[in-house]
């Protein structure tokens, strides 16, 4: 029975910069892919490709998750692939009915799953809400471990809606799970910003930061920003190691396990619409053991980033709008003679604390430069001022 179910997807309206390797990387996050065949139209039309999965359920989940998603600035069209033999049967409407039934399933995203939760567990948890066509926990292909989220597909829309409403926040395996529609909402009308946004190329973005930088800044989601939303948006591009969201500021940071995955995410998500907001994506700040970002700053025209999870964005005044309280700020004085960002003396002490790295000359720079009499290697709240 499984062998008779379709496993190959048509992926169209692709950018000419998209490669088979990128398509495989994106679609393999949903399920193991057997192969990908890119078709380049010599007549000048947009390229398209066919992606074949090992199992029908993975192909169905990829259809739900990837149709309408932007890849390198273009909204791709995903559908079941048809063969010449199936096209001949269209007159009997059998193929049309089969395809329509597959597309009429309603897919629910289930996030924040405990590592021990299996496909059978989520299927059993959602079974009381109606007839389920498919359920699965997404696993990492390399380790075989759960990625912490999954999908449940219902035959009936109302069953899916009821499951989303009733199961959101419920406990499953020691964690409160999150639920939402797996498919995206209809795209909002393009704003002036989105229409005028320059499309980034992968080669340009991947070279903007050092190979050790795996952090993406995503800003502009001024309402509805959650960790679940960011995980759902960025998980197709690679393994996510950490997500930090700041809903009151409208931005988040997503750290991947590889520089290449982060670059693909920046290229694909920048300028797209999330929850009705056009988002901006840049490289996050590199940590202290990475190369000095000042040289990168001069190459790409962005100011030096601030904070351990800072972002390449705007000027110093703009950065002040985005940095949350309790994180590193542009300038510090020494303990005993410290200034806030407005330059007012805040603290007096008879003896300044020299810190564990006293005597080590820090690098000089426009941001975080040492003030007069400031001890080397001084830290504030655990963050170095260099």
UniProtKB/Swiss-Prot annotation:
Compositionally biased region (Polar residues): 363-376
GO cellular component: a single term: cytoplasmic stress granule
InterPro entries per UniProt: Nucleotide-bd_a/b_plait_sf, RBD_domain_sf, RRM_dom, RRM_dom_euk, TIA-1_RRM1, TIA1_RRM2, TIAR_RRM3
Outcome reported for the amino acid change (mutating residue 294 to M): In ALS26; uncertain significance
Record note on what altering residue 360 to M does: In ALS26; uncertain significance
Main localisation: nucleus
Gene3D superfamilies assigned: 3.30.70.330
GO biological process, one term: negative regulation of translation
Result of changing residue 334 to I: In ALS26; uncertain significance
A Pfam family it matches: RRM_1
Keywords, alphabetical: Acetylation, Amyotrophic lateral sclerosis, Apoptosis, Cytoplasm, Disease variant, mRNA processing, mRNA splicing, Neurodegeneration, Nucleus, Repeat, RNA-binding
Region ranges (Disordered): 354-386
RRM domain sequence ranges: 7-83, 106-184, 214-286
MF term (GO), any: mRNA 3'-UTR AU-rich region binding
SMART domains referenced in this protein's UniProt entry, alphabetically: RRM, RRM_1
Main function: RNA-binding protein involved in the regulation of alternative pre-RNA splicing and mRNA translation by binding to uridine-rich (U-rich) RNA sequences. Binds to U-rich sequences immediately downstream from a 5' splice sites in a uridine-rich small nuclear ribonucleoprotein (U snRNP)-dependent fashion, thereby modulating alternative pre-RNA splicing. Preferably binds to the U-rich IAS1 sequence in a U1 snRNP-dependent manner; this binding is optimal if a 5' splice site is adjacent to IAS1.
Subunit note: Homooligomer; homooligomerization is induced by Zn(2+). Interacts with FASTK; the interactions leads to its phosphorylation. Interacts (via RRM1 and the C-terminal glutamine-rich (Q) sequence) with SNRPC/U1-C (via N-terminus); thereby facilitating spliceosomal U1 snRNP recruitment to 5' splice sites.
Record: disease: Welander distal myopathy: An autosomal dominant disorder characterized by adult onset of distal muscle weakness predominantly affecting the distal long extensors of the hands, with slow progression to involve all small hand muscles and the lower legs. Skeletal muscle biopsy shows myopathic changes and prominent rimmed vacuoles. Rare homozygous patients showed earlier onset, faster progression, and proximal muscle involvement. Amyotrophic lateral sclerosis 26, with or without frontotemporal dementia: A form of amyotrophic lateral sclerosis, a neurodegenerative disorder affecting upper motor neurons in the brain and lower motor neurons in the brain stem and spinal cord, resulting in fatal paralysis. Sensory abnormalities are absent. The pathologic hallmarks of the disease include pallor of the corticospinal tract due to loss of motor neurons, presence of ubiquitin-positive inclusions within surviving motor neurons, and deposition of pathologic aggregates.
Domain notes: The RNA recognition motif domains RRM 2 and RRM 3 are necessary and sufficient for binding to uridine-rich target pre-mRNA. The RRM 1 and RRM 2 domains are required for the localization to stress granules (SGs) and for the recruitment of TIAR1 and poly(A) RNA to SGs in response to stress.
Name of the protein in question: Cytotoxic granule associated RNA binding protein TIA1
Species of origin: Homo sapiens
């Amino acid at each position: 029975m499984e062998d008779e179910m379709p496993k190959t997807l048509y992926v169209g309206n692709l950018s000419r910069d998209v490669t088979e390797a990128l398509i495989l990387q994106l679609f393999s996050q949903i399920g193991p892919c057997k192969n990908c065949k890119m078709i380049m139209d010599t007549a000048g039309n947009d390229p398209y490709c066919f992606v074949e999965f090992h199992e029908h359920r993975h192909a169905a989940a990829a259809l739900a998750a990837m149709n309408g998603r932007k890849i390198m600035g273009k909204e791709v069209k995903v559908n079941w692939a048809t063969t010449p033999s199936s096209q001949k049967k269209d007159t009997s409407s059998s193929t049309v009915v089969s395809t329509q039934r597959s597309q009429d399933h309603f897919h629910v995203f289930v996030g924040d799953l405990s590592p021990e939760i299996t496909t059978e567990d989520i299927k059993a948890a959602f079974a009381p809400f109606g007839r389920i066509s498919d359920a699965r926990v997404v696993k990492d292909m390399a380790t075989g471990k759960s990625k912490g989220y999954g999908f449940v597909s219902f035959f009936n829309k109302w069953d899916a809606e009821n499951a989303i409403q009733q199961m959101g926040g419920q406990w499953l395996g020691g964690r409160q799970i999150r639920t939402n529609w797996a498919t995206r909402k209809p795209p909002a009308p393009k704003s002036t910003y989105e229409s005028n946004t320059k499309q980034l190329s992968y080669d340009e973005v991947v070279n903007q930061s050092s190979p050790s930088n795996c952090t993406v800044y995503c800003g502009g989601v001024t309402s509805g920003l959650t960790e679940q939303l960011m995980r759902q948006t960025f998980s197709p591009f690679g393994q996510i190691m950490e997500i930090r969201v700041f809903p009151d500021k409208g931005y988040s940071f997503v750290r991947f396990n590889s520089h290449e995955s982060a670059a693909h995410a920046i290229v694909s998500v920048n300028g797209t619409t999330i929850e009705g907001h056009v988002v901006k994506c840049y490289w996050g700040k590199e940590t202290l053991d990475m190369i000095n970002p000042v040289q990168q700053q001069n190459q790409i025209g962005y100011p030096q980033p601030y904070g351990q999870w800072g972002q390449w964005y705007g000027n110093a005044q703009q950065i002040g709008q985005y940095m949350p309280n309790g994180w590193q700020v542009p300038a510090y004085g020494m303990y005993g003679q410290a200034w806030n960002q407005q330059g007012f003396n805040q603290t007096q002490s008879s003896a300044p604390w020299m810190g564990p790295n006293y005597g080590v000359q820090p690098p000089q720079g426009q941001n975080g430069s040492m003030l007069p009499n400031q001890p080397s290697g001084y830290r504030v709240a655990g963050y170095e001022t260099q």
